[in-house]
Amino acid sequence: MMKRQFEDVTRIVIKIGTSSLVLPTGKINLEKIDQLAFVISSLMNKGKEVILVSSGAMGFGLDILKMEKRPTNLAKQQAVSSVGQVAMMSLYSQIFAHYQTNVSQILLTRDVVVFPESLANVTNAFESLISLGIVPIVNENDAVSVDEMDHATKFGDNDRLSAVVAGITKADLLIMLSDIDGLFDKNPTIYEDAQLRSHVAVITQEIIASAGGAGSKFGTGGMLSKVQSAQMVFENKGQMVLMNGANPRDVLRVLEGQPLGTWFKQIEEVTHD
């Protein structure tokens, strides 16, 4: 088994999903957000550069507007997300400030990273913020994103968005926090003998086929989108860890090399002269 070595990792993208930020009751998980802010601030104090990709706008919006479930109407979905995004960033700003860490907001649509001019601008924005010691908090701009064939601006979900952000910022590592322990050889909710894959070097058709199921009622990303995100990370010669976000402090353990979650890392070919 390959040993995980993250000593040389400087720039880290951390992605947290709605299911990790919102309790099953629909209320905001304040303890989880506080832990996340502590972990990221600790990493910043150690000289790391951290970008946070955060879902949760819809979950926050549903809570504020006291709605039981996400609307089926697109315009109402966008309205709820717009309300929730403000609340989410306000809370992040307050809690990160407790740890003397400044944050900023970057809202992206897919067309921004497709066109070279806008891609250059957003890349420069990331670099400027990082150089100032600020944590960029990234989300999709749900209020304006559309998924129409002639003008598709949606990423699909924040799993893919986090892989895109890791690529354009040339991050050393993407850490994806989810409500599952990692990638299993089969669905652990159905099969008791399902085994956690500690290391994945190649995304095979078998892995893609076994990654099924949708996300939670508050979020959208299922296992398939996480596997597809790992594929994007591989295409950018990067690495990714998919792990349970129940205890964000586990991120520090992962960076120490402890074998939590699933490590997606291609095996480098050895060339002989």
Swiss-Prot record:
Biological process (GO), any one: L-proline biosynthetic process
Binding, ATP: 15, 178-179, 220-226
Recorded catalytic activity of this chain's protein: L-glutamate + ATP = L-glutamyl 5-phosphate + ADP
Family matches, as PROSITE patterns: GLUTAMATE_5_KINASE
Involved pathway(s): Amino-acid biosynthesis; L-proline biosynthesis; L-glutamate 5-semialdehyde from L-glutamate: step 1/2
EC number: 2.7.2.11
Enzyme class: transferase
Keyword Transmembrane (UniProt): no
Transferase is among the record's keywords: yes
UniProt binding sites for substrate: 55, 142, 158
Gene Ontology CC: cytosol
Entry keywords, A to Z: Amino-acid biosynthesis, ATP-binding, Cytoplasm, Kinase, Nucleotide-binding, Proline biosynthesis, Transferase
GO function terms (MF aspect): ATP binding; glutamate 5-kinase activity
SUPFAM superfamilies on file: Carbamate kinase-like (SSF53633)
Subcellular location: Cytoplasm
UniProt-listed InterPro entries: AceGlu_kinase-like_sf, Asp/Glu/Uridylate_kinase, G5K_ProB, Glu/AcGlu_kinase, Glu_5kinase, Glu_5kinase/COase_Synthase, Glutamate_5-kinase_CS
Stretches of the chain forming a coiled coil according to its record: none
Entry-linked Pfam families: AA_kinase (PF00696)
PANTHER family: GLUTAMATE 5-KINASE, ISOPENTENYL PHOSPHATE KINASE
Role, per record: Catalyzes the transfer of a phosphate group to glutamate to form L-glutamate 5-phosphate.
Family statement: Belongs to the glutamate 5-kinase family.
Protein name per UniProt: Glutamate 5-kinase
Source organism phylogeny: Bacteria, Bacillati, Bacillota, Bacilli, Lactobacillales
